[in-house]
């Protein structure tokens, strides 16, 4: 099984994090470590979610039940790249650059929906989280087709939010460190590989400004465990898949001023961890062309979702195709996502008992497309 087919499946798998749980935008794949020889790659993705909801209860004269939120999830681009070197027969190294977490939420101001400013004079609600990650890895090849690998990851993160009720918060830009460790077994003659990777949590201690007042809080990017596998099942045909667990129940954004004003609520938090399953088939059509199809599933957790992230689980289908030209490989991929239905809860300031539904976000979807260019040198 040649590199062209493996590159096709790699881009197909990478696209699955575009709508993953929490605020994850990149799974931090270490697949580059298993490329043949010296290798460089660059990926560009465009993600266009379509997430909208309907208000279930009135929140004032200008914010009635039935108000439509409009699409609250702006499209965004995603960049990543990496370089891998063969240092010796037993040692290989790689540097990976990605955007591991991110979020973009924008409730329009002219909809009547509460978070769009339907019952207040402060306008809509906007939130943004940005990050940049750099990972350095070493892989040591042991006898019997076994390898171990590990390294350090630095993540730089910042964010800001402004809500319909006049609350505004921005953070400092913080850079902190975590680590990755893993092990793999390979059988190259049938393109078989199983790899297990653990990524540690990374905690940021932010300085923040809430409505002009200096505050501080901590947020933890959660730990994760990823099992990836692939094997040839027939001439020029590869089956691949993964199972990824992320400890999202440990993630929260809880600035102290917001918590005090709302009786201890968080801006963003998650009650449950997520497990994402991916399964696909790759096929080499010729020495120059290969393709792949894949499906991905993340179960809904139930309960309420946050008003700044009203989704719950997802199901997706994706395709990718690769063209090899000399030492270059160019891959195009696309994925359509059925985003899980979600309900959000009324804020504590409204005269409703806890557990009252504010918004129903149903029948939402998204489209992700990507381009990857790889070069063997």
Annotate the PLM regions.
Residues 21-23, 52-55, 59-61, 78-80, ...:
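Outer-membrane beta-barrel porins/channels
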Residues 2-108:
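N-terminal, post-signal peptide beta-strand-biased segments of exported outer-membrane/organellar beta-barrel
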